[in-house]
A protein has these predicted regions:
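Small-residue-biased structural context
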Residues: 1-166
Length: 166
């Protein structure tokens, strides 16, 4: 699979995670006919674990952003997770599912990004901008507090210390 710019959401961390999932799908493709089932199993396991952590990150982001379809989006993730878990169980049972899994993942990921993930982008970007603004405001507040504290300490010094600090 090759990443295409139209899949970019414009949210750096999400795009980085999506690209990493594509890397896992490509590793799966490379190993699909390998006699090394252990290596194939490792890639499948790592890909599933990473994808689940991505889902948690993404779901938390869109819930915090107040995205109105966060619930249905999470359901789509749950259905996908169930399908992949079933395939992983079949693999663990000795069945050769690499080509089937690769095909399903390839189709699902790109369709999901285009049709589902792009829906939350505006809400998530607005939320992230506000969060960054709040962080900046908090830094400014803390800075002002610190300066005020330093001023108060300076005023509390005795007349001799104030005289010598001039």
């Amino acid at each position: 699979l090759a990443w295409v710019p139209e899949l970019d959401t414009g949210i750096d961390e999400i795009d980085r995670q999506h690209r990493r999932i594509v890397d896992y799908i490509n590793k799966l493709y490379e190993l699909r006919e390998s006699p090394d089932r252990e290596a194939l199993g490792d890639v499948i396991g790592e890909m599933v674990d990473y994808t689940l952590s991505h889902f948690v990150f993404e779901e938390t982001l869109i819930e915090n952003a107040g995205y109105m379809f966060a619930g249905p989006h999470k359901k789509v993730h749950e259905l996908f997770t169930r399908r992949v878990s079933e395939m992983q169980s079949r693999f663990d049972g000795g069945e050769d599912v690499a080509a089937e899994l690769h095909g399903m993942l390839s189709r699902w990921l790109f369709n999901h990004i285009r049709n589902e993930d792009h829906g939350y982008v505006d809400a998530a970007k607005t939320y992230l901008r506000m969060a960054r603004g709040n962080e900046q405001a908090e830094r400014e507040r803390l800075k002002a507090e610190l300066l005020q504290e330093l001023e108060q300490r300076q005023q509390k010094k005795g007349w001799l210390a104030r005289l010598l600090s001039r």
